[in-house]
Structures are given as C-alpha cells and as structure tokens.
Amino acid sequence: MTSSQPYTLTQLGWKPFFQQQLTLEDYENTQICRIVAHHRSGYQLCSEQGRFHLAIHHAQPKMTVGDWVLLDEQQQFKRLLERQSELSRKAAGSKIAEQLIATNVDTLFIVCSLNDDFNLSRIERYLSIAKEAHIEPVVVLTKADLSPQAEQNITQVQQLSATLWVEAVNALDPVSVAALQPWCAKGRTVAFIGSSGVGKSTLTNTLLGEETQQTGGIREDDSKGRHTTTARSVHMIPDGALIIDTPGMRELQLADCSEGVSETFAEIETLAQHCRFKDCQHQQEPGCAVQQAIDNGTLEARRLQNYFKLLREQAYNASTFAEQRNRIKQIGKMYRHVQSDKQKLKTTY
C-alpha cells in the first residue's frame, strides 16, 4: 500500500462480518484501520482517514497483517476485531509458540515451482493449514518451462482433490497470470505462501503491474530460492484485490490443525470407516480398507505416510501448546494470589 491517499473501507476489504462487531460509540469515537504491514518497530495501518504507525506494546494482543483494529481519538490502540480467518504455524525452531502468518484472508495462493522445489507432501501441508483456517486454497504452479515433467506434476496436484483449483502460470507474463483474476476481485484479500524463490514476489509484481517487491534468483546447484521478501505487507492491485506477500518459509510446522488435516486427507478417513477393526492402524491388519486401496492403486503410499506424519506433528504441537497455556494460566493464578495477599497485608496495617 504505497499510495498516501486514504482508502475506503470497502477497498480495504471491509465486510459485514466486521461491521456487526461495532457499536454506535465505536462509529462515533474510533477510527477503523487495517494492518497493512508488520515490522519490528510496529504496524503500518490504513484507514479512511489516512495512514498511521502503531508501535508494538506488550499490553496489545498479538496482531499481524490483515487484522482490523480500532484506534481512539489520540490514535492509540483500543480494540482488535474478531478475525474471519487466521493463518498460523508453529514458530520456527524449538520455540513453543504459534506464529501468525496473516488474517482475514479470502483465498490462499499456494505457490510451488515445477523445478526441484516441487513436492506434493509440502503442498498437502499448505492445504491443511488453509483448510484449518477455512480459507479457499488455490495451487499456483510456476516455472513449468524448467521442468520436462511439468504436465505430469500438474496432473499429480490435480489428483490431490477433485475440488482443488490448480493454475499453472508464467509469473512474468501478465496474460498468463490473468488466470488468477477470478480470485482477485475488488475488496477481496488474497495471500501468497510458499518456499523462497518459487515466484511469489514475481507474481505480486506482475499483478500490480510494477516492480514493488524485490525478486531474487535460484541457486543453480540445488534449485533453492533466495529470500527476497523479509516482511509481510499488503498491496492493492488494479483489479481492486488486496495481496499479502509473505516471506519464503524454509520450515512450516503445523500448530493445532486436526480439522485441516482431516479435510485434506478426507478420502483416507472415509476408507478407514470400512476397515474390519475400529482401532485399525492401517499397517498390516487384516481387512484394512486403506491398505487395500494402496494395493489396488487408488491411494498412494506416499500420501498415507504424509497423513501419518502430519497427524503426529499436529498432535504433538497441539499438546505442547495446551501445556504452555496451562502453565501461563497457573502463573496468572499465582500472581493474582500474591497480589491479593499483599492487599490483605496493607489493609491489616
């Protein structure tokens, strides 16, 4: 969002879902803003009144690009509006924390290049996150000219789900990228997600019609991309949609994502209902409908193994998040107890 001119709420993606959360007092005494950039120093906000910078404060809730917030008359944070959707992952590394990627997104463009980066299991991981957030996923395949197996790879992605939208585009060609326009109508918010170097920033620039995002090349030795986007930000394209370009992710672990995994691998869970034993582990048990599907070629063994992997990952991370929340809750109780004892001592004296 590089223009200094104010935007209407409709242009910023305002919907009845958010309007229903406001009171008459909110309309009269607050400014409705959307977070369009998130930096270490704070948030960049856009509203009908213009642009604002909001410093990060420990008393604020965790926020990110896409959030709607209310500011008071002094342009200080007042309230975060409930989110319509929330993209998140487990924070990278050993840290036990959930990291917000973007919020209030209508469509998630899962970008994957058809070179050595192509990985069906990674696409399934992204699909699980999108479905958990109730966001429409669209798989965007780039760099088909670099792969002799492009057509085969495109078919493999299409076979992941009969209802999955898959578009193969040349990220540098506006005519080719026009295939994404049905999801880029005025007031809609779309986000790009994918590994470094797959073409997210190039796609953003092509949709914008200008070189707004820096782009980087691919290392020839391993086809790995270089980080070019280092912070999440919102851009408005000529068609009126808002685009969130996210940094490339070398690590994407699931947080609490059981519903998303179930939806992504729905056919496996349907098959499991026909196993002879209710507690079937889908390994070597007799009468296993899942293993039978693998034997007759209607289910990939790779897909089943990835299903198991994502189930284990999300179950472990969900339990660690729950333990952390319980610890924080206990610390809060202890703090309130100590404060209560201090107050009693004061009244005694």
Swiss-Prot record:
Top-rank taxon: Bacteria
Family statement drawn from the similarity comment of this UniProt entry: Belongs to the TRAFAC class YlqF/YawG GTPase family. RsgA subfamily.
GO molecular function, one term: metal ion binding
Record HAMAP family: GTPase_RsgA (MF_01820)
Cofactor: Zn(2+)
GN (gene name): rsgA2
Binding site for Zn(2+): C275, C280, H282, C288
Identification of the protein by name: Small ribosomal subunit biogenesis GTPase RsgA 2
Keywords (A to Z) from UniProt: Cytoplasm, GTP-binding, Hydrolase, Metal-binding, Nucleotide-binding, Ribosome biogenesis, RNA-binding, rRNA-binding, Zinc
The keyword Nucleotide-binding is assigned to this record: yes
Residue span, CP-type G domain: 97-252
PANTHER family per the UniProt record, alphabetical: SMALL RIBOSOMAL SUBUNIT BIOGENESIS GTPASE RSGA
Protein role: One of several proteins that assist in the late maturation steps of the functional core of the 30S ribosomal subunit. Helps release RbfA from mature subunits. May play a role in the assembly of ribosomal proteins into the subunit. Circularly permuted GTPase that catalyzes slow GTP hydrolysis, GTPase activity is stimulated by the 30S ribosomal subunit.
Residues that bind GTP: T142, K143, A144, D145, G194, S195, S196, G197, V198, G199, K200, S201, T202
Keyword Metal-binding (UniProt): yes
One Pfam family in the UniProt entry: RsgA_GTPase
Annotated compartments: Cytoplasm
GO biological process: ribosomal small subunit biogenesis
Primary localisation category: cytoplasm
